[in-house]
Amino acid sequence: MKISSNSEFGFPNCITFKIDPFSSSESLKQINRSANSEFILLIISESEIELEQYAYERISSLAYAFNSGIIYSDYFDKENELLTPHSLIDYQTGSVRDNFNFGHIMFFRKDIFSEATNELRDGYRYAGLYSLRLNISIKYPIIRIPEYLYSATGNRISEKHFDYVDSKNRDVQIEMEEVFTDYLKRINAFIKPPVDDLDLYSQDFKNEVSVIIPVKNRLRTISEAVNSALSQKGNFSFNLIVVDNHSDDGTTEVLKILAKSNKNFIHLIPEGINLDIGGCWNEGVHHVDCGRFAVQLDSDDIYSDENTLQKIVNVFRKEKCAMVIGSYKLTDFQYNPIPPGIIDHREWTKENGFNNALRINGLGAPRAFFTPIIRKINFPNVSYGEDYAAGLAISRYQKIGRIYEPIYICRRWEGNSDSFLSIGKENTYNFYKDKIRTLEILIRQQLNAGKHD
């Protein structure tokens, strides 16, 4: 059975009407008024869909068995008659990104769809479907069937990781944030802005700033990162702590040479061999010579100029906050800009950034931490999302300062860990970040209920 959102694939007994955009409140209400069946299957892409054997029966039976609000499934990408399995991830409490990947179809029981659309606020042009999904999730489970129940031809689903920082999408993101903030209030996970200033100088430190570089096997880039850190200038003392996670490609030897000629350079090799990036960060921030502020520099990247650390320190001192996050420019290995260019996270506001941070997939870079705070929180020992987890935990209680000009250059190249992710790796990363959000939402609910310190 072939179906499609494209009108040229229509059938007899089908009602055709124009809706623009598909995700608006009015479009969803029009669908609800027009549908007189027991179930509604939404095709949320422009692909041609072919259901597999007994797929409809499989989905519809589970819709009642689990009182499911929404059902989605894994699928095949079909190209030139070749089928490639495409697995998705399970929906959980923290699956609140507006670009969560449901694949190409979402399956609803009509009675639940009607209930949700009747509660849907009028006027959303872009966030209607997002609001519908969040509202359904409050009352009903959202179920993934880990079976390939259809194939999709053309228009592969792409999770647009930087939509929330693209100025062209500002109107979209304002709606999404409004919907999400309302959702947090409904589930008692909304928090008020932290207002207390930190006493940044109640403790003594040998250095004001430490640049922390976790590294493993970055022979090609580590020298540039080290030189970028050591070239910083400012009205403070600083050092560089490189946590070398047992590199075996020559990186260790390069670092030993560089450390000999720089008294402010600490080359640290952890005792343990089971550390990921988060664990290496913990080694750095707990080092006896770590400065008052610990500032990120990835082993692939460099600071924009010699004033990056000074700009970060200025924000700490002015705003008396626990964390400062800058903006960065995306480039290739030769420093040529690549889309979307500058990532500045202007979606962040002092009034609601700490709530909206649960909706987006990252906080920005470079990230800098007030060392006594990050020593209490620590990073999870993982190599993806460790910074996001720490940032969310800090935002729960403390202010976060922002710098909206690019002070950091993030390079994408064939050896970079974020390049050319497989479906499996991308699913692993997304599931983990959703789990971080799940835990954070639960903690904030407990805080609001007076059950968590």
Model-derived regions: residue spans:
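Short, flexible, basic/aromatic active-site loop/helix in glycosyltransferases
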Residues: 79-103, 340-360
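Glycine-rich, basic loop-to-helix element that forms the pyrophosphate-binding segment
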Residues: 22-35, 271-289
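Short, acidic, metal-binding catalytic loop of nucleotide-sugar glycosyltransferases
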Residues: 2-12, 227-237
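A conserved acidic beta->alpha catalytic loop
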Residues: 47-49, 244-254, 273
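Acidic donor-binding loop at a coil-to-helix junction in glycosyltransferase catalytic cores
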Residues: 122-132, 383-390
